[in-house]
Amino acid sequence: VTKEPRDAPQFYLTSPAPCPYLPDRLERKVFTHLIGLRAPSLNSALTLAGFRRSQTIGYRPACEDCRACVSVRVKAAEFSASRTHRRILKKNQYISSHTQPKHATHEQFQLFRRYLSARHADGGMADMGMGDFQMMVEDSHVDTRIIEYRLKSGPNACEKLVACCLTDRLSDGLSMVYSFYDPDLEEHSLGAFMILDHISRAACEDLPHLYLGYYVSGSRKMSYKARYLPQERLGLEGWSRFDA
């Protein structure tokens, strides 16, 4: 009998729970632990297979009667900014981005709390405290960092933290794990700006892909991911290219 290697990942299945994307649906997830020296390579391999990361857990939807969640990755080097994207970049030309180590700060946490209160007050993360936020950022065995976005309002003004993104570096791209921004700057489209910045970062690092997570047909809050082209979506026969 062939024995499984002792360090091979073990996969588990969650119990059914309400779907966060589509009403009146239940979701299940398959998950494994991303720990130890193999965690970075396993994270890359699992992301390629449609998984996402949350702290030391890699997970993927495993719903019995639904395949609405589709992994999406942007072709970074081939990306062509639309007129809307160019307007967003111009509007945010005074915002600078800074790569920081995976260390949670109180400044980041205060912005995170304001974002949740304004955008996801009824969500599962609404009650997170500083300790929970610190775990989200720092509890990781993979190659991750937090990218800060700061706006300088004047020649002598301090740069104000307006957005953050927890980002993984994979063997074939960058993965945006979680992002949040100042809800008072709605006109700046900071969520879109962070995606555009990450596409540029991936291309500059000669990484072919930016992983955006799941595109969910029928979910308004996930539909924006279809706007970044060209992109590939993961189906039963592998990754398929979409140019429109």
Regions found by a protein language model. Give the residues of each.
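Residue-level preference for non-acidic, small/hydrophobic
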Residues: L46, F112, I195-H198, K225
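A conserved beta-strand-loop-helix scaffold within acyl/acetyltransferase catalytic domains
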Residues: R52, I57-D65, V72-E187, R227
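Intrinsically disordered, low-complexity, positively biased terminal segments
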Residues: V1-T84, K90-Q93, Q100
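Conserved acetyl-CoA-binding loop-helix of GNAT-fold acetyltransferases
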Residues: E187-S200
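Active-site/acyl-donor-binding loops of N-acyltransferases
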Residues: R60-P61, V70-A77, H209-A244
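Active-site catalytic microenvironments for nucleophilic, acid-base chemistry
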Residues: A118, D197, R201-E205
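A short pocket-lining beta-strand/turn micro-motif at the edge of beta-sheets
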Residues: D172, E186, E205-L210, K221
